[in-house]
């Protein structure tokens, strides 16, 4: 993975101000690089390498796993939901890889700001498109309510996405997505008490999905474990890498719930009113 001799790496104090967002990661910062220099950093050790590969390898796996395990031929008119689900699973790790790979670009803060916005758009997409099949299946037998719920959640997601894009800090970005999480919990609650429908085993997957995502966000905001040992987790095992792994698990739980849900919706006959 890391087999080239890279440039002289910087410490936290010497890195550009826009990259000084974690004061507990003390070393391993790449110097300002050209586009080709950023690509070359795939092959030498630095403090973003783990972030790049955790989501890069996950993206390669999702590119195979998600489309191949989606039962396209059985979805019928709900095939568009399979498409939105694939986008929801693939865009976040792709945006994350681009963000972490090119964040040291010599274009400086303006380029970094655009990359951060791209990364936030990926998070917003998984929160938005990822929930549409869940809402669709939960309200499968309430056709009068389903369109309003889908449009309402989409509008809420637009507000959450804007707040995340304009948030001044990591904790503010996490709070921006809280409204979407709250709306999903209402949907899960409706399903849990019998007011909603869906495949029997999907709800636990969705609960694990949001639990993993929340845990990852909290670990990232708390800067753990590097807060307990500044400099000890500069390259491996820091909070952002842990968040990446938890987010991969969250997407896998989403996929594990959506596939049986869509199959259930395709074959289930709602009782007459």
Swiss-Prot record:
Q: In which tissues is it expressed?
A: Expressed in adipose tissue.
| Membrane topology category | Multi-pass membrane protein
TM annotation in the entry: 52-72, 79-99, 115-135, 185-205, 245-265
Q: Which InterPro entries match?
A: AdipoR/HlyIII-related
| Keywords from the UniProt entry | Golgi apparatus, Membrane, Transmembrane, Transmembrane helix
Q: Which GO molecular function annotations are given, in alphabetical order?
A: molecular adaptor activity
Q: What is its main location?
A: Golgi
Which GO terms fall under biological process for this protein?
protein stabilization; regulation of ceramide biosynthetic process
Phenotypic consequence of gene deletion: Knockouts adipocyte-specific show a normal phenotype. Upon high fat diet, body weight gain is comparable to widtype after 18 weeks. Liver weight is reduced with diminished steatosis and brown adipose tissue mass is reduced. Animals show an improved glucose and insulin tolerance.
Please provide one cellular component term from the Gene Ontology annotations of this protein: Golgi membrane
Q: Does the keyword Metal-binding apply?
A: no
Could you tell me where this protein is found in the cell?
Golgi apparatus membrane
Induction remarks:
Upon high fat diet, expression is induced in adipose tissue but not in heart.
Q: What does the similarity note say?
A: Belongs to the ADIPOR family.
Q: How does it assemble?
A: Interacts with CERS2 and CERS5; the interaction regulates CERS2 and CERS5 stabilities and activities and is inhibited in presence of ceramides.
- Main function: Plays a role in maintaining adipose tissue function through the regulation of ceramide levels. Mediates the stability of ceramide synthetases, CERS2 and CERS5, and their activities.
Q: What is this protein called?
A: Progestin and adipoQ receptor family member 4
This protein's species is Mus musculus
